[in-house]
Structures are given as structure tokens and as C-alpha cells.
């Protein structure tokens, strides 16, 4: 009974969520688009000519935002957007997509080959592992995913590039922040208005690689 009530509460909240309605009106595939938009506007990130890598891209709302930001005359992407997810993603015009597990060495190699040695301007990651409900195990999974995104960014970003990663407050969060601060000159936490109040998610924005 409790599970059914939770389900009904979630559906009611979802239907009445203003960001869900705005996403539908603007053609975004998920309300998460507004989280990225707020972060980009606040941090003044992403512009035409950038090379952007979108990790954990499905269903595609962040790639849609990136496409809007990089669109030049005639709507053609000025720059590159490379997206990756374990799940399938409906095509987004101008976005190069790889379906595969970012933790898989062969998939990572495919992504690196697609980047082709070009200096990346921005890595955005909305990746989140499947959670078990066991605190210690979940914290380790979250930390691992964040560290993978961090390692990729440090190996491919240009010196003044940036990384946006979803993380969750809880055990292991301070270690994640510390790892980011060891590699970047500036690291800030952002909780966009579109993040639900009850959610422990926060976004780390790291800028300017340390030499």
C-alpha cells in the first residue's frame, strides 16, 4: 500500500511540475534541460565553436540544449557535440552519439577516437549509477562515476576548459569535491532551481585545469 501511495504521489508531483510543463512546451525531452541551462547561464559556459562531450546523455535534453547553444546561421552546429549513454537515444540533429557503457574500456576507446585528439571545451555529465539503497555501496558507485568523468575531462579538456558533473550529497561527497579541487583551479557547487527540493543531487562545476 505504501508503495502504491508513493507512486501516486510521484505521478501527481510530476504532472504538476512546472518544469515538466515547460519542457513539453519547449520540446525538451526532459526537465533536466533547465538544470543545465541555469548552470550554463550562471557560469557563462558553452558558446559557438566549442567541442562538447555529453556523458549520460539519454534521453537527450542536455544534447538539445548544447545544440541550441552551438547553433550557427541556418541552425547548423558550429562546433561539435559528442554524446554517450548506455541507453539508446533518439537522434538530435548535429549530435554524434555512441551507445555503450562509459565504464567499458572499449567504449571509452571509441569515444576517444571520435574526439580525435581535438581539445574539448566542456564535458557535461548527468550520469548516475543504479542505486541499491545500501548507503556505502551507493556512495562508492557515485564516486566511481564522478571519478571516471573527471579522469576523462582531465585527459581531453583544453587548459581553460570546464567540467559539469552530477553528484549527490552524502558519504563520499567531500572526497569527490577534494578530487576535483586537486585537478582544477576553481570548483563550485550548483543546485539549480529545477532540482527537486527533496533531491540530494548537486552539480559540481570545475574550471581551468591545474598544470
From Swiss-Prot:
GO terms for cellular component: cytoplasm. S-adenosyl-L-methionine binds at residues 60, 62, 85, 101, 126. The active site is at 166 (proton acceptor). Its EC number is 2.1.1.166. InterPro entries: RNA_methyltr_RlmE (IPR050082), RNA_MeTrfase_FtsJ_dom (IPR002877), rRNA-MeTfrase_E (IPR015507), SAM-dependent_MTases_sf (IPR029063). It holds the Pfam family FtsJ. It is an enzyme of class 2 (transferase). Specifically methylates the uridine in position 2552 of 23S rRNA at the 2'-O position of the ribose in the fully assembled 50S ribosomal subunit. HAMAP family: RNA_methyltr_E. This is Ribosomal RNA large subunit methyltransferase E. It comes from Bordetella petrii (strain ATCC BAA-461 / DSM 12804 / CCUG 43448).
Amino acid at each position: 500500500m505504501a508503495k502504491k501511495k508513493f507512486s501516486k504521489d510521484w505521478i501527481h508531483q510530476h504532472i504538476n511540475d512546472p518544469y515538466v510543463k515547460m519542457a513539453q512546451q519547449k520540446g525538451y525531452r526532459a526537465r533536466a534541460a533547465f538544470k543545465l541551462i541555469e548552470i550554463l547561464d550562471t557560469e557563462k559556459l558553452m558558446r559557438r565553436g566549442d567541442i562538447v562531450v555529453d556523458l549520460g546523455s539519454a534521453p537527450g535534453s542536455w544534447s538539445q540544449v548544447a545544440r541550441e547553444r552551438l547553433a550557427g546561421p541556418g541552425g547548423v552546429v558550429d562546433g561539435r557535440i559528442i554524446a554517450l549513454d548506455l541507453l539508446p537515444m533518439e537522434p538530435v540533429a548535429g549530435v554524434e552519439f555512441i551507445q555503450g557503457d562509459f565504464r567499458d574500456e572499449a567504449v571509452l576507446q571509441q569515444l576517444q577516437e571520435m574526439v580525435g585528439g581535438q581539445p574539448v571545451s566542456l564535458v557535461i555529465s548527468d550520469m548516475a549509477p543504479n542505486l541499491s539503497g545500501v548507503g556505502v555501496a551507493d556512495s562508492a558507485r557515485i564516486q566511481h562515476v564522478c571519478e571516471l568523468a573527471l579522469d576523462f575531462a582531465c585527459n581531453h579538456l583544453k587548459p581553460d576548459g570546464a567540467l559539469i558533473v552530477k553528484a549527490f550529497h552524502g558519504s563520499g561527497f567531500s572526497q569527490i569535491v577534494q578530487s576535483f579541487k586537486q585537478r582544477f583551479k576553481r570548483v563550485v557547487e550548483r543546485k539549480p532551481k529545477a532540482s527537486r527540493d527533496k533531491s540530494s543531487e548537486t552539480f559540481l562545476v570545475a574550471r581551468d585545469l591545474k598544470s
